[in-house]
């Protein structure tokens, strides 16, 4: 039976299972997939922090539903999605390589279609995702926004994990420890 960490995300209370990673570190696992009420709550709270941005970008997969809610709340008809593998429709897109995240443990790449890259060009871009921990995934998104010619306006996360809670360049709704 898993242990749990109880958290409060701006009034939304939930319990996160504590799970071990292969490197021996334990994390409080945050999963928005399939949880419509939590996604709506977190997306609306992040949207309050995103005022002034022209477009939202996220990385698949857990950020997708957040980006949808934030964009809807801001009245934006589109948001950009960085994919973790190159899709058929991305032949004329852009890509960046970045380091390993705490959950994958391996170097990765992010891909952006030409359509989504064009959405970012010259725009104030708000990066939205579920959790920031090591900052490697964020670095990949920042590099992608810069490569597309966007202007990084805000970096918003539901949770800041571990040392990420001390970063001054990001905003979060709650913090969790590395265990």
Regions found by a protein language model. Name each.
Residues 1-53:
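Active-site-facing substrate-recognition patch
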Residues 2-6, 139-179:
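PRPP-dependent phosphoribosyltransferase catalytic core
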Residues 53-60:
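Short glycine-rich phosphate-binding loop at a beta-alpha junction
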Residues 54, 123, 153:
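Conserved acidic residues
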Residues 60-66, 134:
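Gly/Ser/Thr-rich loops at beta-strand to alpha-helix junctions
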Residues 65-74, 141-142:
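Short Gly/Thr/Asp-enriched flexible loops that form oxyanion-binding sites at enzyme active sites
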Residues 74, 96-101, 171-174:
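Short, hinge-like loop/turn segments at secondary-structure boundaries
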Residues 78-125:
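Short, glycine/charge-rich flexible loops or terminal/linker lids adjacent to PRPP-binding catalytic cores
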């Amino acid at each position: 039976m898993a242990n749990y960490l109880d958290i409060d995300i701006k009034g939304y209370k939930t319990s996160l299972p504590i799970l071990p990673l292969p490197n021996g570190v334990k994390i409080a696992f945050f999963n928005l997939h399939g949880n419509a009420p939590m996604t709506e709550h977190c997306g609306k709270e992040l949207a309050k922090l995103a005022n002034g941005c022209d477009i939202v970008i996220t990385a698949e997969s857990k950020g997708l539903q957040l980006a949808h809610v934030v964009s809807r709340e801001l009245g934006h008809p589109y948001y950009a999605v960085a994919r973790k593998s190159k899709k058929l429709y991305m032949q004329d897109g852009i890509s960046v390589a970045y380091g390993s995240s705490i959950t994958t443990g391996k170097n990765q790449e992010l891909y952006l279609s030409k359509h989504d890259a064009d959405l970012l060009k010259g725009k104030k871009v708000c990066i939205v995702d579920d959790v920031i921990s090591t900052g490697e995934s964020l670095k990949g998104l920042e590099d992608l926004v810069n490569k597309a010619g966007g202007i990084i306006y805000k970096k918003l996360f539901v949770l800041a994990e571990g040392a990420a809670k001390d970063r001054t360049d990001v905003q979060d709704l709650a913090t969790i420890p590395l265990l």
